[in-house]
Amino acid sequence: MYYTMKETCEMANMTYEALKYYCNVGLIPNVKRDKNNHRVFDENNINWIKSLSCLKNCGMSIKEMQAYLKLCLQGEQTIPERQEMLEEQKYNLIKKLEEIQESLKYIDKKQKFYNQVLNGEVEYHSYLIDTSKKS
């Protein structure tokens, strides 16, 4: 079964512009055309497009995705290189996750402080303005 660009975008949760761009830069191999010369996609294309979305969300650049695709098209013998690329992306994601967790800790701490101030449990202080009471 073949799907239109619009259907493929919906299935892959991707914008029409992004899908068209990925096609134009050669990131989606083996795309067929219908009798009106419109691109049509099969299940294999859609699964690959979903993989591209994941790689993009990992922070992989277009150039890196093109290199990954090239390795994929060479077959099983390139699995070690692909594993290495994915390991690097995983490392980057773990670092990002750690940064996000630190940011969440900061926000939780600030929210707790603000709640304590609003409840009259602690006195408000600021690093930015002078909050000392002048007599």
Regions found by a protein language model. Give the residues of each.
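C-terminal regulatory/oligomerization modules of transcriptional regulators
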Residues: 76-135
